[in-house]
Amino acid sequence: MDKVQYYRRKSLPLEMHKICIVQKTRIPSVEERVSAIREAGFNSYCLRSEDVYLDMLTDSGVNAMTNEQLGAMMVGDDSYAGSATYYRLAAKIKEIFNKDYFLPVHQGRACEHMLALAFVQPKPGSIVPMNFQFGTSVGKIKYCGGDYVICLQEDGLNRQSSNPFKGDFDLEKLERVLKEQGDNIAFVRIESGTNLIGGQPIALDNMLAVSELCKKYGVLSILDASLLQDNLYFIKTRETAYSDKSIREIVRTLSDAMDIIYFSARKLGFGRGGAIILNDKKLFEHIKTFVSSFEGFPTFGGMSVKEMEAICVGLDDTMDENIIAQGPQFIEYLCNELEDAGIPVVTPPGGLGCHLDAMKFVPHIARKDYPAGSLAAAIYIA
């Protein structure tokens, strides 16, 4: 993973790509911004895109694509059944993840819907332990009559910490839940990395230990690999046992331990879509019935074949250390610069973005008054 190392100064990350197409933008005046945020009810989510100079909200599905991805989109096979595009993507998934069966869906939350229908709905009141919750995940679980238990390790919610893997499971708590709930467990969900606590990663050894507990208690282990790209970088650079392993080797080790993997290809693969992958043919056939009912024919699942071709290339790109290093390295650089300026941020730097610690930034605003939302509105105006 390449960096520029100065003789007297700290290193700087490099952008390992060329930019071929640019899009013009503009900075609205202060008066325009005040008017826009007032019209939006001081809710940055309600701003119009033309009133925003730098969009730091829209992350997935709008990323730039490589020239190889754009080229691949031109060879998509639109056949309703037996599409060559499906088989190309299935072969790529087999190559990288060593999983025999692949179900395409239109995006990550659709994966969660299919899995909740398959494993939660048949057992009303069932429980899904997880390292941390994500809105769409728990929404689908509850919609299908289940509930969830967070088993995040104690340090996970500390906003300032030196713990390199704040997304780890508390293994003792997980085992306690598995013992107490027994047959009432639908599956264990492992989020890699952990979105809502600042993109914090989970260690590979921790995920392998979770897998062993699942095997011990006869429970399915299901990996949400949507944010796996950043997590792979952190395993490679923070987990010394795997520092000499290639990204492909790390992925294979993790994948072999999991019963089912799903992901939003908007994050993993740089395209608009999603996938559920597994090795158990009986489970595959069970989940496939829901894909056919809710998503589309099992060889495209509501995805455009152009996007499927792009994802095929994008998954290969995810195995490139220089590509997956881009986000974490620049996020770390920004976090360090802000910390040097006395601005409170979530540490250690994670994936997704550099997260300001709003509770420390605006301590005079009570939690019930939405300090983070208030801070976002103020930064927009400033």
Question: Can you annotate each of these PLM segments?
Answer:
Residues 2-42, 46-52, 56-64, 69, ...:
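Conserved PLP-enzyme active-site core in the AAT-like
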Residues 344-382:
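Conserved PLP-binding catalytic core of the aspartate aminotransferase-like
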